[in-house]
UniProtKB/Swiss-Prot annotation:
InterPro entries: DHquinase_II (IPR001874), DHquinase_II_CS (IPR018509), DHquinase_II_sf (IPR036441). This is 3-dehydroquinate dehydratase. The keyword Amino-acid biosynthesis applies. The record marks R17 as: Transition state stabilizer. Belongs to the type-II 3-dehydroquinase family. GO terms for biological process: amino acid biosynthetic process; aromatic amino acid family biosynthetic process; chorismate biosynthetic process; quinate catabolic process. Its EC number is 4.2.1.10. It comes from Prochlorococcus marinus (strain MIT 9211). The keyword Transport does not apply. The active site is at Y22, H99. Pathway: Metabolic intermediate biosynthesis; chorismate biosynthesis; chorismate from D-erythrose 4-phosphate and phosphoenolpyruvate: step 3/7. One of its GO terms (molecular function) is 3-dehydroquinate dehydratase activity. Catalyzes a trans-dehydration via an enolate intermediate.
Length: 148
């Protein structure tokens, strides 16, 4: 089983950017922790971050047939990117949307997701634990699906 963790714009600044909202851990430390967890579960995990919408779309396209599911923190693209939504849907790869902060408790423009309605699930508001919860959720989903 192989998973892809995609992180969108500004997430490369985690630990420095608004730590009162996004926490003090770096993206690298989150990826290391999740990679260790994946290894313990016998799951492959590839991590990728880009500030560019087109690069994220290309990466999703390149993942077709290579990954079983995607964990995606699309950052601000969650609220604006029809291209990212279309890439996820056309790839036909199950995905979980995740966010560090509770986007529904923030500004109105952050309360709309263009990805959520087609996601397997959405995890939001648990800080860095959102990554672990999303990982566990998609892992359970894939394992249960394979039993059917």
């Amino acid at each position: 089983m192989n998973l892809l963790l995609l992180n969108g714009p500004n997430l490369n600044l985690l630990g420095k950017r608004e730590p009162s909202i996004y926490g003090s851990q770096s993206l690298e430390s989150i990826e290391i922790s999740l990679s260790q967890r994946a290894k313990e579960e016998g799951v492959g995990l590839e991590c990728f971050q880009s500030n560019s919408e087109g690069t994220l779309v290309d990466y999703i396209h390149q993942s077709i047939g290579k990954v079983d599911a995607i964990l995606i923190n699309a950052g601000a693209y969650t609220h604006t990117s029809i291209a990212l939504r279309d890439a996820l849907l056309s790839a036909e790869i199950p995905y979980v949307e995740l966010h560090l902060s509770n986007t529904y408790a923030r500004e109105t423009f952050r309360q709309k997701s263009l990805l959520a309605d087609r996601a397997i699930g959405v995890v939001s508001g648990f800080g860095v634990m959102s990554y672990q919860l999303a990982f566990q959720g998609i892992l359970d989903y894939l394992r249960n699906r394979s039993k059917e």
